[in-house]
């Protein structure tokens, strides 16, 4: 087992900087596209054998130092009773967004092993195949709540923020229910064999720091506290969260994921003693080889004083990224960071 990723998460010395990429199992890989040509996205997410195949692809093809479970953060919302659709070209849709207490009351807190047993089976199967650590994950309550309230993706989050400020009790009720379900979901993943867990807060950066502290952070803290019994690295990724960095560090996470909008060395000085993950702009993978290697070298140099660095993108890899560019990045990180 190559445990370089786990060592970096714990802030231990490593022979080189480990790398994996958010959304590394996905649309940019021809092998993934071939599978998706036969099944819908939701069908794929619920098929353990296919999920195993997709999860393994970037590890086998590109040499990643960790695998991340192939799934989606909104699978849990469907298990809670929210009708979920994935429409080509417009992403996830909840046709019945939560607008009132009646809709909230209709959501359930499912038994994770029962309602999302296909996820746990995928984890168990992967542990028998992988020679690198397996990362499980869930969406942070705030990010998941935005989808339930907006009915899908949003650019301005009008419905979410309107509810926060005009119906705070309803908003907190939604967050409470999602939090309880997420705790059970991630605990089940840990029991199934996940070796690290990441909490994706894709939309945290739309919040003012004072609102993040009230409406989002307390729920993340509760989730992380509930996972301490498993002694696994917990990664918290708050996208566009440079203004939230110190508060994110108080979440209890072992590792903070960074987007590309902050210098990783500066981040390390602001939150000393915590491992950091990131943080090249996903579009920088399109650079010519020499310029990409130079960009990677700069990030590695900036991160030299960070106590534990996992190289990653600042967000998910873009679907039109040539796989060979991802391979160049993996090789560059390994070569340039070799101690």
Curated annotation (Swiss-Prot):
Entry GO MF terms: uroporphyrinogen decarboxylase activity
Subcellular location: Cytoplasm
Enzyme class label: lyase
Residue(s) at site: Transition state stabilizer: 72
CDD domains from the UniProt entry: URO-D (cd00717)
Pathway listed: Porphyrin-containing compound metabolism; protoporphyrin-IX biosynthesis; coproporphyrinogen-III from 5-aminolevulinate: step 4/4
Gene Ontology CC: cytosol
Major localisation: cytoplasm
Catalytic activity: uroporphyrinogen III + 4 H(+) = coproporphyrinogen III + 4 CO2
EC annotation from Swiss-Prot or TrEMBL: 4.1.1.37
Residues given in the record as substrate binding sites: 23-27, 72, 147, 202, 315
Keywords: Cytoplasm, Decarboxylase, Lyase, Porphyrin biosynthesis
Pfam families tied to this protein: URO-D
GO biological process: protoporphyrinogen IX biosynthetic process
Superkingdom of origin: Bacteria
Its job: Catalyzes the decarboxylation of four acetate groups of uroporphyrinogen-III to yield coproporphyrinogen-III.
Complex and partners: Homodimer.
Family: Belongs to the uroporphyrinogen decarboxylase family.
Listed name of the protein: Uroporphyrinogen decarboxylase
Annotated organism of origin: Desulfotalea psychrophila (strain LSv54 / DSM 12343)
Gene field: hemE
């Amino acid at each position: 087992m190559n445990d370089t990723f786990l060592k970096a998460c714990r802030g231990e010395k490593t022979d080189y900087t480990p790398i994996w990429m958010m959304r590394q199992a996905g649309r940019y890989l021809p092998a993934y596209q071939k599978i998706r040509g036969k099944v819908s996205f939701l069908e794929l997410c619920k098929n353990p054998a296919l999920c195993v195949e997709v999860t393994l692809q970037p590890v086998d093809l590109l040499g990643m130092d960790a695998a991340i479970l192939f799934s989606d953060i909104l699978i849990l919302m469907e298990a809670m009773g929210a009708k979920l659709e994935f429409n080509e070209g417009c992403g996830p849709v909840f046709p019945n967004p939560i607008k009132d207490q009646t809709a909230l009351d209709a959501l359930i807190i499912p038994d994770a092993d029962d309602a999302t047993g296909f996820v746990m089976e995928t984890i168990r199967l992967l542990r028998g195949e992988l020679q690198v650590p397996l990362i499980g994950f869930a969406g942070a309550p705030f990010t998941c709540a935005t989808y339930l309230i907006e009915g899908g993706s949003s650019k301005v989050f009008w419905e979410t923020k309107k509810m926060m400020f005009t119906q705070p009790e309803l908003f907190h009720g939604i967050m409470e229910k999602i939090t309880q379900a997420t705790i059970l979901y991630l605990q089940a993943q840990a029991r199934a064999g996940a070796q690290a867990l990441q909490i994706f807060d894709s939309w945290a950066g739309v919040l003012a720091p004072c609102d993040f502290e009230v409406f989002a952070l307390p729920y993340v803290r509760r989730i992380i506290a509930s996972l301490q019994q498993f002694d696994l690295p917990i990664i918290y990724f708050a996208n566009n969260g440079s203004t939230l960095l110190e508060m994110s560090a108080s979440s209890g996470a072992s590792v903070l994921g960074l987007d590309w909008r902050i210098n990783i060395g500066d981040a390390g000085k602001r939150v000393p003693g915590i491992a950091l993950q990131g943080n090249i702009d996903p579009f920088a993978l399109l650079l010519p080889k020499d310029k990409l290697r130079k960009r990677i070298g700069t990030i590695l140099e900036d991160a030299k004083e960070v106590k534990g660095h996992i190289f990653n993108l600042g967000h998910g890899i873009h679907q039109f990224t040539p796989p060979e560019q991802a391979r160049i990045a993996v090789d560059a990180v390994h070569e340039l960071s070799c101690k």
